[in-house]
């Protein structure tokens, strides 16, 4: 699919500039369509007046030939009456193998090497329709990650949408980095990463780590960081998704799409909505919140035989899961992995809350009976332990009955055994990551719940892989 437009480009003039919002006047019979990209040349004050091309995206038709556009770059140096060219098409990004190993901005410009060196042969527009209903794949298949807590308690769906919920600093980005490494190593798949409104330092660290671990060559990265205008942050997820769609639809590959952070996408939408003068709705969010989220999420799907599996980090403002931004995202997800601050404070990583996290396929219709039984058993023990917490806090553990003491004894071991060393956290811990097959996880948790390892000290269960790791740690602590 090509995006060339044969018509002569219409030219207008800048009528008004207010921050990233630019009003442009065109001839009434040559107004650009909504979502068209406009180009305007400016003298950049930061570069001693060097000329650069700004890209604007049409957001509203105000009438009488005037359109309101949102700038994708800072508008410093833009003046009234500056000539503006309508490109006749929306923003486009490069697609195909040329994107692997490269870092792009929202406009598809390469950031980590000279653009002239890249052999870009095809570009797709970022605004595209979702696949037709009859093209969708209805088969449900589990996506194994090698992380015990995820595979056992919140199994991911191949071609599904996975949400990583958590407040600041509980490990969302580390878990996403871990999944990128695991996908490249375990599944030999293509990954596309969208950095939406996150810290530039984190993006830089991610690129360095991916280069070191050798997975950068299988990944395309698209960044629209915190310091960029809201228009860029609102569109960066669509740019990355377009690259992923090409791998799925043309190259017939299974793709993993990582979005960090989907909350910043909502936040950018809220800023743009306010700039366009729309009336805010609940908690100050844009009135089109559900619609904008739906447009993005409906394109992330599986078509016949090929899938886009997406993992989305979702910042939870003030740890409040009822906030409209995370609440709107919930409706689209197949699995939710809730990262908990109290669990991260215990030093248990990944800090997944086993009772709050859910999965659509944690059901005997989709997974084995053994898997379902083990997951239910583990959740049951942890739930009972949680129910006893108040009594323990007030009266102490000695006031519990023998049966309850045994539940607490085993639950503490189960809780610690849910922790695991990850490849991405090696820089913090100095320990190699571990991969635990699902069958081994099921057998290990059944054995712990049966009391086979009641005589092992609690610290032996902490940050280990499978049963062999557990036994080796116990031996180090002097227990056979």
Swiss-Prot record:
Origin: domain of life: Bacteria
Membrane topology: Peripheral membrane protein
EC number of this enzyme: 7.1.2.2
GO molecular function: ATP binding; ATP hydrolysis activity; proton-transporting ATP synthase activity, rotational mechanism
PROSITE patterns in alphabetical order: ATPASE_ALPHA_BETA
Family annotation (InterPro entries): AAA+_ATPase, ATP-synt_VA_C, ATP_synth_F1_bsu, ATPase_a/bsu_AS, ATPase_alpha/beta_chains, ATPase_F1/V1/A1_a/bsu_N, ATPase_F1/V1/A1_a/bsu_N_sf, ATPase_F1/V1/A1_a/bsu_nucl-bd
Binding, ATP: 166-173
A Pfam family hit: ATP-synt_ab
Coiled-coil residue spans: none
Gene Ontology cellular component annotations, sorted alphabetically: plasma membrane; proton-transporting ATP synthase complex
Annotated localization: Cell membrane
Keywords of the record: ATP synthesis, ATP-binding, Cell membrane, CF(1), Hydrogen ion transport, Ion transport, Membrane, Nucleotide-binding, Translocase, Transport
EC top class, as a word: translocase
Catalytically driven reaction(s): ATP + H2O + 4 H(+)(in) = ADP + phosphate + 5 H(+)(out)
Family to which the UniProt record says this protein belongs: Belongs to the ATPase alpha/beta chains family.
Functional description taken from the UniProt entry: Produces ATP from ADP in the presence of a proton gradient across the membrane. The catalytic sites are hosted primarily by the beta subunits.
PANTHER family the record matches: ATP SYNTHASE, ATP SYNTHASE SUBUNIT BETA, MITOCHONDRIAL
HAMAP family: ATP_synth_beta_bact
Assembly information from the UniProt record: F-type ATPases have 2 components, CF(1) - the catalytic core - and CF(0) - the membrane proton channel. CF(1) has five subunits: alpha(3), beta(3), gamma(1), delta(1), epsilon(1). CF(0) has three main subunits: a(1), b(2) and c(9-12). The alpha and beta chains form an alternating ring which encloses part of the gamma chain. CF(1) is attached to CF(0) by a central stalk formed by the gamma and epsilon chains, while a peripheral stalk is formed by the delta and b chains.
UniProt protein name: ATP synthase subunit beta
Gene symbol of the encoding locus: atpD
């Amino acid at each position: 699919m090509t995006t060339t437009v044969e018509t002569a480009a219409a030219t207008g003039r800048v009528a008004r500039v207010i921050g990233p919002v630019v009003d442009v006047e065109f001839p009434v019979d040559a107004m650009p369509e909504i979502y068209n990209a406009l180009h305007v040349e400016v003298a950049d004050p930061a570069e001693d007046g060097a000329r650069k091309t700004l890209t604007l995206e049409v957001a509203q038709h105000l009438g009488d030939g005037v359109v309101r556009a949102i700038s994708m770059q800072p508008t410093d140096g833009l003046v009234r009456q500056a000539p503006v060219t309508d490109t006749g098409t929306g923003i486009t990004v490069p697609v195909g193998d040329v994107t692997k190993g490269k870092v792009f901005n929202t406009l598809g410009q390469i950031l980590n090497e000279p653009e002239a060196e890249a052999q870009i042969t095809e570009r797709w527009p970022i605004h595209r329709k979702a696949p037709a209903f009859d093209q969708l794949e209805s088969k449900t298949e589990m996506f194994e990650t090698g992380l015990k807590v995820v595979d056992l308690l919140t199994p991911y769906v191949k071609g599904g949408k996975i949400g990583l919920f958590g407040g600041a600093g509980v490990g969302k980005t580390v878990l996403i980095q871990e999944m990128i490494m695991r996908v490249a190593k375990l599944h030999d798949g293509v990954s596309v990463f969208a950095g939406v409104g996150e810290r530039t330092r984190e993006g830089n660290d991610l690129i360095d780590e991916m280069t070191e671990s050798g997975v950068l060559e299988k990944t395309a990265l698209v960044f629209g960081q915190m310091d960029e205008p809201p228009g860029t942050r609102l569109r960066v997820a669509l740019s990355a998704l377009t690259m992923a769609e090409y791998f799925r639809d043309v190259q017939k590959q299974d793709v993993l799409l990582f979005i960090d952070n989907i909350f910043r996408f909502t936040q950018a939408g809220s800023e743009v909505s306010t700039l366009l003068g729309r009336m805010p709705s609940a908690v100050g969010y844009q009135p089109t919140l559900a619609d904008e989220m739906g447009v993005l999420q409906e394109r992330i799907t599986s078509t016949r035989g090929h899938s886009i599996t997406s993992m989305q980090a979702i910042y939870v403002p003030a740890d409040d899961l009822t906030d409209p931004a995370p609440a709107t995202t919930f409706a689209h997800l197949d699995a939710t992995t809730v990262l908990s601050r109290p669990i991260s404070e215990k030093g248990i990583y990944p800090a997944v809350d086993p009772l709050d996290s859910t999965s659509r396929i944690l059901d005997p219709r989709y997974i084995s009976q053994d898997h379902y039984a083990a997951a239910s058993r583990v959740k049951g023990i942890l739930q009972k332990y949680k129910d006893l917490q108040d009594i323990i806090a007030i009266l102490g553990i000695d006031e519990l009955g023998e049966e309850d003491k045994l539940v607490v004894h085993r639950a503490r071991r189960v809780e610690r055994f849910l922790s695991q060393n990850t490849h991405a956290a090696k820089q913090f811990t100095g320990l190699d990551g571990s991969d635990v097959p699902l069958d081994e996880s099921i057998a290990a948790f059944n054995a712990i719940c049966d009391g086979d390892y009641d005589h092992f000290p609690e610290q032996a269960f902490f940050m280990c892989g499978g049963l062999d790791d557990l036994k080796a740690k116990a031996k180090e602590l002097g227990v056979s």
